[in-house]
Amino acid sequence: MGWPQFMPSSWVKYAIDFDADGKVDLFNSQADVIGSVANYFKAFGWQTGMPTHYPVSFDTSKLDLDTLLAPDILPSFGVESFTAKGAVLEGPALQHPGKLALVLLENAGAPPTYVAGTDNFYVVTRYNWSSYYALAVIELGDAVRALVPSR
């Protein structure tokens, strides 16, 4: 329902009057829409400042792809365990404090793409369970953020 396409149960639980006009309006109030989606993410564990995902490559001599993919998109591996199974992380990903999931994205005949998904990636998939949707929304958000002047 409305711009965020909330199910009725999500409207009841997560929709908020973010513009403080006395009513929740997910059809006409951009503030209520954005605030309600943010409230939904918060309820599912969004962690401010945590990246949604990191690039990942593989050390094929150690790669245990079946084990890495077994939990699907649920973050289940600490960095040490993730890399011990053949995932290669770089830079800030090596210091990630939480769990990671290996997210597989098929590419219609081309080799698949993989990312190391964090708890925040998982939160986005609670809104829409598709990993493709999650990555598209994340990349769109990054593009919008790049166009908005810093405050």
Question: Locations of the language-model features?
Answer:
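C-terminal soluble interaction/assembly domains
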Residues: 59-151
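Flexible, glycine-rich surface segments
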Residues: 1-100
